[in-house]
Amino acid sequence: MVVVASLLVTALVAAGVTLGILQLQSRTNPQQVNLRSGVTISEESAVTQVAARAKPAVVSVVTHDQPRLGRGSGYLVTSDGYIVTAVNVVAGSSRMTVLLTGDAKLHDARLVDYDCQTGVAVLKIDQVSRLPTLAFAPDPTALVEGQVVVVVGGPLEGGAVTPGYVSALHRPVTVTDPVTVRTVEISDTIETTAVIGSTTAGGPLLNVGGQVVGVAMQSQGSSEPGGFGLNVADITDDVQQILATGHVVVSSLGATNTDLSLQTAALGGLPEGSQLVTVDKTGPAGAAGLQPGDVITQLADVKIDAAHPLRLLLRSQFHPNQRITVTYFRAGNSTQVQLTLAGQHPSCA
């Protein structure tokens, strides 16, 4: 078994080194860097420094029980082996291993918990200590369009570094639930010109200060030329909950929903908000009389819009067992109702 693992690591590292050499060669030509990512030569020094500081904390995640080996990235958030990655990296896998930077050993990893509403997953490797870590940006709301960001991949990819810009915020993308393998839309991601492949997905999206502002990810079936990132503003609470308790619990209406942009809502003669798709009759929404088709426009005094989607508001500004006022639209009329929020693992429906 040790021999097999050794051969596997050797083969994977060899492939990663080859890829890393090719990417390094392309990065040493400033014109190629500019053409690919739009990052100017004056920013190269900052990008290089960020990558050098981040690489020791970036890992490769290998999934073993698919038709072929799957490879992605992640990064350490604690010195004893907790790793943040994207749900797409581990979707459908029951056996995962992790390769640390500067290590030749594959460490068995387990999925601690995940949230397919935000797209984040947390893994754990055991019998490790004093590992380097990366920190979340202290003010993720400071992220703006046009800001320089850097994606760093794991050691199997030669620590691939891809710089780029934040091209848009609050973009919807589709990901896969790692347990049920169903797809779900995430409504608040970062779009970047940095090219993100399947092997760098799950790695950190960093600002020029070397702080994590997102988690790199691929969108299923996307035709966009760049990549996407899970916004740290949305995943921080999840990660903290998982580290503290081993699982994620968020406030819930007991209903599934789809967000309506201002443009989409206008086409249907509806207000901007979140339209209920299914309602559990025994849950808070059902007990309060809400029905499928109702459009939630406000929770308490917070309006539902592209920057404040319903699911993220429920997790960020409210808590289970809290009594709130819900404003909703039905048949041309706006109505308010009071209900008490439930607590549950984030729904992936």
Give the ranges of each region predicted by the language model.
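PDZ/PDZ-like groove recognition
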Residues: Q25, I186-E191, V195-I196, L243-L313, ...
